[in-house]
């Protein structure tokens, strides 16, 4: 199961949170879901060069809060915040609601699977050999602290007549372990021979449940924590 399913979806509610945070009844659910898709598509197309990894959307009444996770916040914000203000107005026109935009910087782009996948796709479009592109990103990610990485390219690789999939990996990528923090990204490269799909899995370590401290245990159970009671 872990080998086939999207690792992000499998871990939602366990170690990952939802990217859309809102509630709607049956009548409005489809319309709001389509609105989310439109917002994400618009931002990705408008800020293609900014290295957008993910877009979180929160809703409350007639207000929409959009959080953009980007490797290049300067491009999104612009001089004196002009670009982000322009983006906010365009999103308000698109949705007809009050929109606030929050920019979140990605400190280490080499550990973000979506950005790594888009990087490989961009190299393939520049006619760089797919094996070289894969080995480069794998090497960079491991140097920046990844515990493991797997990159797969599928399609008419190097212009071959028959499509195939090739992959390159380093370290370990435990897809079945639900506490494993595995990031997944997918991108497409439009080459002269057709589309080439790029998939990236990055293992960033385990997310362990919060350790129960004696003080917390005492507060919940109404008992004194060890070492705190009087003689």
UniProtKB/Swiss-Prot annotation:
Disulfide bonds: none annotated. GO terms for molecular function: mRNA binding; rRNA binding; structural constituent of ribosome. PROSITE patterns: KH_TYPE_2, RIBOSOMAL_S3. SUPFAM superfamilies: Prokaryotic type KH domain (KH-domain type II), Ribosomal protein S3 C-terminal domain. Keywords: Ribonucleoprotein, Ribosomal protein, RNA-binding, rRNA-binding. Residues 39-107 form the KH type-2 domain. The keyword RNA-binding applies. Gene3D superfamilies: 3.30.300.20, Ribosomal protein S3, C-terminal domain. GO terms for cellular component: cytosolic small ribosomal subunit. One of its GO terms (biological process) is translation. SMART domains: KH. Part of the 30S ribosomal subunit. Forms a tight complex with proteins S10 and S14. Belongs to the universal ribosomal protein uS3 family. Binds the lower part of the 30S subunit head. Binds mRNA in the 70S ribosome, positioning it for translation. This is Small ribosomal subunit protein uS3.
């Amino acid at each position: 199961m872990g080998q086939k399913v999207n690792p992000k979806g499998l871990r939602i509610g366990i170690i990952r949170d939802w990217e859309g945070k809102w509630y709607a009844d049956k009548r409005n659910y489809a319309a709001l879901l389509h609105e989310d898709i439109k917002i994400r598509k618009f931002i990705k197309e408008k800020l293609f060069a900014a290295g957008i990894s993910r877009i979180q959307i929160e809703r409350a009444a007639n207000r929409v809060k959009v959080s953009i996770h980007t490797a290049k916040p300067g491009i999104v914000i612009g001089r004196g915040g002009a670009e982000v203000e322009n983006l906010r107005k365009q999103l308000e026109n698109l949705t007809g609601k009050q929109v606030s935009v929050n920019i979140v910087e990605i400190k280490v782009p080499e550990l973000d699977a979506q950005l790594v996948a888009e990087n490989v796709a961009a190299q393939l479009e520049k006619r760089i050999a797919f094996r070289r592109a894969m080995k480069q990103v794998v090497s960079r990610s491991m140097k920046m602290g990844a515990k493991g990485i797997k990159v797969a390219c599928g399609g008419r690789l190097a212009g071959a007549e028959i499509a195939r999939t090739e992959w390159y990996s380093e370290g370990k990528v435990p897809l079945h372990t639900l506490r494993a923090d595995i990031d997944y990204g997918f991108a497409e490269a439009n080459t002269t021979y057709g589309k080439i799909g790029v998939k990236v899995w990055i293992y960033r370590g385990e997310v362990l449940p919060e350790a129960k401290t004696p003080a917390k245990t005492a507060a919940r159970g109404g008992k004194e924590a060890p070492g705190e009671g009087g003689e």
